[in-house]
Amino acid sequence: NCTNFNSNRSPWKIKQTNKAGLTDWNLKGDKLEKFPNSLRSEVIKPIMVIEEAGKENWNITANHALDPLSDFNEIYLTDNVKFNKFDNFKVSEIYIITSSAIVYPSEELIKTDAFTTIITPNSKTTGTGLIANIKEGYVKILSNARRLSYTKDRSEQLEGDQMLYNLKKKSWVLLKKENDNDTNL
């Protein structure tokens, strides 16, 4: 893997490529701060694009990013964190809003324990905690899941402990109902 890095240009940017020379992800921001006597670096107004085998893209933005080891394997995002997955036609498939999250670019994994809102073309789902596995194609709400779906003719509400959104099928599944830990749908 190769990482191209340039912090002297405006805006600051970095690009991660794989062994085949294809871009895995890009990260840019208004400013990169590297702290003396520390491995830590911070990015102000980060914008990250994770590419899925040249198909869809995940666009990730926040007000602040922290990389504790400056290796871009674990990036802590805070303040106004947004994830937007676009299809080949640049249509938003899923939009995730939260206050903080950790992105693991090489694993194509996103995690948070914060309150999260997920918007799809026909629903709005909220909950606490989230795991988004880009490679496997799912988004999982970890607790207090509540979904409101709507069509032209009606709306429907579903609540439970955990819910899973399949990015390929574009559908939600209730994993656990509240007050009934043995129920899996």
Language-model region placement:
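Mature-chain termini and adjacent capping regions
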Residues: 1-185
